[in-house]
Amino acid sequence: TPNNPNWEVTDISSASELAHKAGAKLIVDATATPPTMTKSLNLGADISFHSATKYLNGHSDIAAGALSFNQQSSMYENLFTIRKLHGTVLNSQDAFLLIRGLRTLFLRVEKNSQNAMLLAKHFNNHEFIEKVLYPGLETHPNHQIAKHQTNGQFGGMLSVIVKGSQTDAINVV
C-alpha cells in the first residue's frame, strides 16, 4: 500500500483486523512506502515486504527483496529454511551496495516526497491534466488514511490522467 498506478491506500489497521478475524495473515507490499515513511508492522501487518532494488537500494544496481515479520512464526521458519536450502542470500557485493543505499534512504525518501508533492500540485492545476493520483494531495480519496499511516511524507511516485485521447496522452509524454 499504496498500489501503483492508482495510488489507492489500504487502511492497514482495518485490513489487519479483518484478516485476523478470519484467521488469516496480513501481508503488505511496502515497496512504495519504505520503513522511513510507514511502519506497516506497527499498524498490524504480519509481514511487510519490499523490493530492495527500488527505494531501499536507491541505485537500481542490485536485484533483492526484503521480508519483515511481526513475530517469529511457522511461516517465518518455513521461509528461513527455504532460504537456507536454496541459497537465496545476497552476495557480498550486493549486500555492500544495499547498505550503501540504506545510508541515504531517509534523505532520498524525504526529497523524493517533497519533489513528488511539488509535481502533484503543479499537475493538479495543469490545463492538459484531468486528474492527479497522489495520496499527498488533500483531494485524494485516501489522503487521511495515508496521512495517518505515514510520517507526513507520501512517497516519490504519482500518476496523472491526461485529458483527451490516448494520442493526447502520448503527446504529453
Regions found by a protein language model. Give the residues of each.
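Conserved small-domain helix->loop->beta segment predominantly found in fold-type I
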Residues: 117-173
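Conserved PLP-enzyme active-site core in the AAT-like
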Residues: 1-128, 133, 139
